[in-house]
Amino acid sequence: MITIFNKLKQSLSKTSNTISAGIDKIFYKRKLDKETLNELEELLISSDISISVVTHIIEEFKNVKFDKTIDSDTVKEAIAKLIEQQLSKSEIPFTLSENKLNIILVCGVNGVGKTTTIGKLSALYSAEGKKVAVAACDTFRAAAINQLSSWVHRANALLITGKASADPASVAYRAIEESIKQNIDILFIDTAGRLHNNKNLMDELSKIVKVIKKLDENAPTHSILIIDAITGQNTYNQIEYFNDVTNLTGLIVTKLDGSAKAGVLVGAVQKFNLPVYFIGIGEKIEDLKIFNRHDFSRSLVGL
C-alpha cells in the first residue's frame, strides 16, 4: 500500500527530480564554496523558490559549512530543514466552529480546480458526519453547475442553486438562509472562476462578501484561494488581488502532481503569511491532503 508520504513524493517528482539531480551534480566531489553556492542558488531559483528564501538558504550555508567538502545528501537535508523553517506559518489547522454555520468562501482563477476541490472537501467533511451544503454562485456558466452537481451528489451534500444568470450574491444570500434553516454545519460558496485583473468579476466577488457580512458580520469563517502549482510566480499576483477583495485566511494548492514549479508554495507562504490548508496531489477524492510542511520540504528536495 502506498503511504501518504510516498504519494506526496511521487506528486512532487517533477520539481524534486530537477532539484535532487541538480544538487547531486553540483556537489559531486566538490567543496561548498563560492562557485558551488552560486550554482545552488541558480538551481533553487529556477525551481520557483522565491529569491528571498533562496538568499536565506545560501547565507545559512555560508555561515555553517563554507569551504568544506560536503556530500549531496547533507545538502538536501540542510535545505529541507531550512525550507521547513520558512514554512513555519503555513501549518495552521483548518478549524471550524461547533454548533453554528461555517461559511467558507472559495475563490480562484479559471482552471485551478476550484469546483473539484470543493467536491473533495464536501466529501471529506460529509464522511466525518458534518452536514454540508454548497452554493453554486457561478451562475453564468451552466457547465459549472453541472460539474458541481456531480461532485456534490457523490459527497452526499446539499446543492443550492439559483436561476441561470442570477445575481451570484443573491444565490449566496439564499444559500446562507437555507443552510441556517436546515442546520447545515458547513456551507461552501463556489464563486465564478475569474481572472484576478478583471475588475467587473472582482467587484462581483466583493458584492458576495458584503452580502455574507450582512447576515453574519463575523463571516465568512474562511476565505480560501485555490491556486495551482503550475502557475509559478504569477501566483503572487493572484494572492495579492484576491486578498484585497476577500481578506484571505488561507490557501489550497492544487496540481502538485503535474508541476515542476512546486517551489512557488514556499515563497507564497513566506511573502503573504498565509497558511496552506490542503494540497492536491491527484485526481481522486482522497488525493486532497492536509498540508504537512515537514513532509513537503523533504519531498521537494527528493528525500
Curated annotation (Swiss-Prot):
Single Gene Ontology MF annotation: GTP binding
Broad class of where this protein is predominantly found: membrane
Pfam families, alphabetized: SRP54, SRP54_N
Membrane topology: Peripheral membrane protein
UniProt keyword GTP-binding, yes or no: yes
EC number: 3.6.5.4
Designated name of the protein: Signal recognition particle receptor FtsY
Organism: Rickettsia prowazekii (strain Madrid E)
